Curated annotation (Swiss-Prot):
GO terms for cellular component: cytosol; mitochondrion; phagophore; phagophore assembly site. Residues 84-158 are annotated as: Flexible region. It holds the Pfam family Autophagy_act_C. Belongs to the ATG3 family. InterPro entries: Atg3/Atg10. The lineage of its organism: Eukaryota, Fungi, Dikarya, Ascomycota, Pezizomycotina. Keywords: Autophagy, Cytoplasm, Protein transport, Transport, Ubl conjugation pathway. One of its GO terms (molecular function) is Atg8-family ligase activity. It is found in: Cytoplasm. This is Autophagy-related protein 3.
Length: 346
């Protein structure tokens, strides 16, 4: 299924008529020329990003310049898995639940998850389980009776397995930004590596994707610019334009409000340069943007907060060449474990 989807996406990008008319402010979509301009801005301001070419001329998109087929950044750190670090208390506490008939303890079942809302955690009251699995009576353990682990000498003869590093420890990612002509917006591809430098198996990349996106808007597909097959995690661009338009509109509304406060003497001007832009982008609310975009019917504007429509071109908060900076802010909400800020150090 992923192969068919990847092939169809490649054909769509190649054979969909190319639009050179800018609708950036109205739709959130960009033209190939605007994509190149945004890529030039990104590589100039953030040198960790660079342009790259397809492996062969046959893999190139004809509407993009040779040598500027896609953007790439490497060695982006990812220190934690979302299934462990974004689960709250789930998985860290367990409770023995009695069976429906009120039988013995071994008739019950083990419930994992937080108990903080159901009962207080009594750390000094424990129940012993013997080798046969029988649960003993409750007993209160005195803290003085608990042995100190530091008092025990390590047995040097013990052979400790190194374990599987695939879902623990530091990973790194190579990130790619391509232009999706069928949707007239950027598309992100991600290729992961283990701490030892070995390629991360594609299915394990899903551990670094927010749960709501797994197998829905994030799929495993071949990277279209390589001659050989390389599976990567890719964020499908079907809703990118609507999400981007929302973020741009919110930024414009915030700029208008800030300028009105400045005129009234109630505020001060924002920072200038890249520091100011990154700071403003970090204030944008991305969490609900994608969900609302999905709910909006095709061809209709998503219903966000009321945005003033009298913002002139001279008052836009984010220019089209700064588009990819905002795009990376959105992608960071999909993969919060990957340190995208590492690629955008000011």
């Amino acid at each position: 299924m992923n192969f068919l989807r990847s092939t169809a996406a490649t054909l769509l990008d190649k054979y969909t008529p190319v639009s050179h008319t800018s609708t950036f402010r109205n739709t959130g979509q960009i033209t190939p020329e605007e994509f190149v301009a945004a890529g030039d801005y990104l590589t100039f301001k953030f040198p960790s990003w660079s342009w790259a070419d397809a492996d062969s001329p046959s893999k190139r998109l004809t509407f993009l310049p040779a040598g500027k087929q896609f953007l790439v950044t490497r060695h982006v750190p990812c220190h934690r898995r979302l299934n462990n670090d974004f689960a709250g208390d789930a998985g860290h506490e367990e409770a023995l639940v009695e069976g429906n008939k009120g039988g013995d303890d071994d008739d019950g079942w083990l419930r994992t998850g937080s108990m903080t809302s159901s009962q207080p955690l009594r750390v000094r009251e424990v129940r012993n389980i013997d080798d046969a699995g029988n649960v003993g009576d409750r007993e209160v353990v005195d803290e003085d009776d608990i042995p100190d682990m530091e008092d025990d000498d390590d047995d040097e003869a013990i052979i400790r397995a190194e374990g599987d590093n695939s879902n623990s420890g530091k990973r790194t990612y190579t990130l790619y930004i391509t232009y999706a002509n069928a949707y007239k917006c950027p598309r992100m591809y991600m290729s992961g590596y283990l701490a030892n430098g070995q390629p991360l198996p594609p299915h394990l990349m899903m551990e670094d994707i927010v749960g709501d996106y797994k197998d829905k808007t994030v799929t495993l597909e071949d990277f279209p610019f390589f001659s050989h097959s390389v599976k990567m995690a890719s964020v499908h661009p079907c809703r990118h334009a609507s999400v981007m338009k929302t973020l741009l509109d919110r930024a414009d509304a915030a700029l208008k409000l800030r300028r009105e406060k400045m005129k009234a003497g109630q505020g001060s001007g924002s920072e200038q340069g890249m520091e100011g832009l990154v700071d403003e982008i970090n204030k944008l609310d991305v969490s609900g943007a994608h969900a609302n975009a999905v709910e909006a019917a095709p061809g209709e504007d998503a219903e966000w907060e009321e945005v003033p429509h009298d913002v002139t071109d001279q008052e836009v908060a984010i220019r089209v060449d700064q588009y990819l900076v905002v795009f990376l802010k959105f992608i960071a909400s999909v993969t919060p474990g990957i340190e995208h800020d590492f690629t955008m150090g000011v």
